[in-house]
From Swiss-Prot:
This is Virion assembly protein OPG100. Disulfide bonds: none annotated. InterPro entries: Poxvirus_J1 (IPR005006). Keywords: Host cytoplasm, Late protein, Virion. The keyword Calcium does not apply.
Protein backbone atom coordinates (compact mmCIF):
# COMPACT_ATOMS: atom_id res chain seq x y z
CA UNK A 1 0.00 0.00 0.00
CA UNK A 2 1.26 3.43 -0.97
CA UNK A 3 1.90 5.84 1.94
CA UNK A 4 -0.61 8.40 0.60
CA UNK A 5 -3.28 5.68 0.32
CA UNK A 6 -2.56 4.74 3.91
CA UNK A 7 -2.81 8.38 5.05
CA UNK A 8 -5.99 9.20 3.14
CA UNK A 9 -7.73 6.01 4.26
CA UNK A 10 -7.01 6.83 7.90
CA UNK A 11 -7.94 10.50 7.38
CA UNK A 12 -11.37 9.83 5.83
CA UNK A 13 -12.26 7.08 8.34
CA UNK A 14 -14.76 7.94 11.06
CA UNK A 15 -12.45 7.18 13.98
CA UNK A 16 -9.35 8.65 15.63
CA UNK A 17 -6.74 6.47 13.87
CA UNK A 18 -5.38 9.44 11.91
CA UNK A 19 -4.77 11.40 15.11
CA UNK A 20 -3.13 8.40 16.77
CA UNK A 21 -0.90 7.98 13.74
CA UNK A 22 0.12 11.66 13.74
CA UNK A 23 0.77 11.60 17.47
CA UNK A 24 3.21 8.73 17.01
CA UNK A 25 5.21 10.58 14.30
CA UNK A 26 7.86 13.26 14.72
CA UNK A 27 6.87 16.86 13.88
CA UNK A 28 8.50 16.93 10.45
CA UNK A 29 6.80 13.71 9.33
CA UNK A 30 3.45 14.86 10.69
CA UNK A 31 3.64 18.18 8.84
CA UNK A 32 4.66 16.41 5.64
CA UNK A 33 1.72 14.01 5.98
CA UNK A 34 -0.69 16.89 6.63
CA UNK A 35 0.62 18.65 3.51
CA UNK A 36 -0.15 15.52 1.47
CA UNK A 37 -3.69 15.44 2.86
CA UNK A 38 -4.25 19.14 2.08
CA UNK A 39 -3.15 18.63 -1.53
CA UNK A 40 -5.87 16.01 -2.02
CA UNK A 41 -8.44 18.13 -0.17
CA UNK A 42 -7.57 21.10 -2.39
CA UNK A 43 -8.15 18.88 -5.43
CA UNK A 44 -11.53 17.77 -4.06
CA UNK A 45 -12.45 21.36 -3.27
CA UNK A 46 -11.55 22.41 -6.81
CA UNK A 47 -13.84 19.67 -8.17
CA UNK A 48 -16.65 20.78 -5.87
CA UNK A 49 -16.35 24.44 -6.80
CA UNK A 50 -16.31 23.63 -10.52
CA UNK A 51 -19.35 21.40 -10.06
CA UNK A 52 -21.14 24.14 -8.12
CA UNK A 53 -20.40 26.59 -10.93
CA UNK A 54 -21.88 24.17 -13.48
CA UNK A 55 -25.06 23.88 -11.42
CA UNK A 56 -25.30 27.65 -11.06
CA UNK A 57 -24.80 28.03 -14.83
CA UNK A 58 -28.09 26.16 -15.32
CA UNK A 59 -29.82 28.17 -12.61
CA UNK A 60 -29.57 25.83 -9.63
CA UNK A 61 -28.13 27.20 -6.40
CA UNK A 62 -26.14 24.55 -4.57
CA UNK A 63 -26.66 25.71 -1.01
CA UNK A 64 -23.85 23.70 0.59
CA UNK A 65 -21.22 25.83 -1.16
CA UNK A 66 -23.21 29.04 -1.46
CA UNK A 67 -22.56 32.14 0.59
CA UNK A 68 -26.03 32.29 2.11
CA UNK A 69 -25.93 28.73 3.45
CA UNK A 70 -25.43 28.25 7.16
CA UNK A 71 -24.76 24.79 8.47
CA UNK A 72 -26.49 23.65 11.61
CA UNK A 73 -25.05 20.99 13.84
CA UNK A 74 -27.64 18.46 14.89
CA UNK A 75 -27.15 16.48 18.05
CA UNK A 76 -29.71 14.56 20.04
CA UNK A 77 -28.04 14.45 23.42
CA UNK A 78 -25.05 15.90 25.22
CA UNK A 79 -22.96 12.77 24.52
CA UNK A 80 -23.12 13.58 20.79
CA UNK A 81 -22.35 17.22 21.56
CA UNK A 82 -19.39 16.24 23.74
CA UNK A 83 -18.08 13.87 21.07
CA UNK A 84 -18.37 16.59 18.41
CA UNK A 85 -16.53 19.28 20.35
CA UNK A 86 -14.18 17.16 22.46
CA UNK A 87 -10.64 18.54 22.11
CA UNK A 88 -8.98 16.17 24.59
CA UNK A 89 -5.50 15.07 23.43
CA UNK A 90 -5.42 11.67 21.77
CA UNK A 91 -3.87 8.75 23.64
CA UNK A 92 -1.07 7.30 21.49
CA UNK A 93 -1.04 3.78 22.89
CA UNK A 94 -4.14 2.70 20.93
CA UNK A 95 -4.09 0.67 17.73
CA UNK A 96 -4.43 2.39 14.37
CA UNK A 97 -7.29 0.91 12.33
CA UNK A 98 -7.30 0.89 8.55
CA UNK A 99 -10.55 0.45 6.64
CA UNK A 100 -9.84 -1.64 3.54
CA UNK A 101 -13.41 -1.62 2.24
CA UNK A 102 -15.24 1.01 0.24
CA UNK A 103 -13.32 3.85 1.87
CA UNK A 104 -10.05 2.38 0.64
CA UNK A 105 -11.57 2.00 -2.85
CA UNK A 106 -12.59 5.67 -2.72
CA UNK A 107 -9.05 6.71 -1.79
CA UNK A 108 -7.53 4.70 -4.64
CA UNK A 109 -10.07 6.14 -7.08
CA UNK A 110 -9.40 9.67 -5.85
CA UNK A 111 -5.66 9.23 -6.29
CA UNK A 112 -6.05 7.76 -9.78
CA UNK A 113 -8.51 10.46 -10.80
CA UNK A 114 -6.18 13.20 -9.57
CA UNK A 115 -3.28 11.65 -11.46
CA UNK A 116 -5.24 11.23 -14.72
CA UNK A 117 -7.35 14.38 -14.53
CA UNK A 118 -6.73 17.27 -16.90
CA UNK A 119 -6.77 19.43 -13.78
CA UNK A 120 -3.67 17.61 -12.54
CA UNK A 121 -1.64 18.58 -15.62
CA UNK A 122 -1.71 22.21 -14.59
CA UNK A 123 -0.26 23.31 -11.30
CA UNK A 124 -3.11 23.48 -8.83
CA UNK A 125 -2.82 26.48 -6.61
CA UNK A 126 -4.32 25.95 -3.19
CA UNK A 127 -8.07 26.43 -3.57
CA UNK A 128 -9.94 28.11 -0.78
CA UNK A 129 -13.57 29.08 -0.71
CA UNK A 130 -13.86 32.73 0.28
CA UNK A 131 -16.99 33.86 2.03
CA UNK A 132 -17.12 37.64 1.50
CA UNK A 133 -19.05 38.10 4.73
CA UNK A 134 -16.12 36.67 6.71
CA UNK A 135 -13.22 38.09 4.67
CA UNK A 136 -13.01 41.83 5.33
CA UNK A 137 -10.58 42.62 2.50
CA UNK A 138 -12.69 40.80 -0.10
CA UNK A 139 -15.87 42.36 1.27
CA UNK A 140 -14.35 45.84 0.97
CA UNK A 141 -13.34 45.20 -2.65
CA UNK A 142 -16.88 44.03 -3.44
CA UNK A 143 -18.33 47.16 -1.78
CA UNK A 144 -16.07 49.36 -3.92
CA UNK A 145 -17.07 47.52 -7.08
CA UNK A 146 -20.76 47.79 -6.21
CA UNK A 147 -20.50 51.51 -5.42
CA UNK A 148 -18.67 52.17 -8.73
CA UNK A 149 -21.42 50.37 -10.61
CA UNK A 150 -24.04 52.60 -9.02
CA UNK A 151 -22.03 55.80 -9.58
CA UNK A 152 -21.27 55.02 -13.24
CA UNK A 153 -24.92 54.45 -14.16
Amino acid sequence: MDHNQYLLTMFFADDDSFFKYLASQDDESSLSDILQITQYLDFLLLLLIQSKNKLEAVGHCYESLSEEYRQLTKFTDFQDFKKLFNKVPIVTDGRVKLNKGYLFDFVISLMRFKKESSLATTAIDPVRYIDPRRNIAFSNVMDILKSNKVNNN
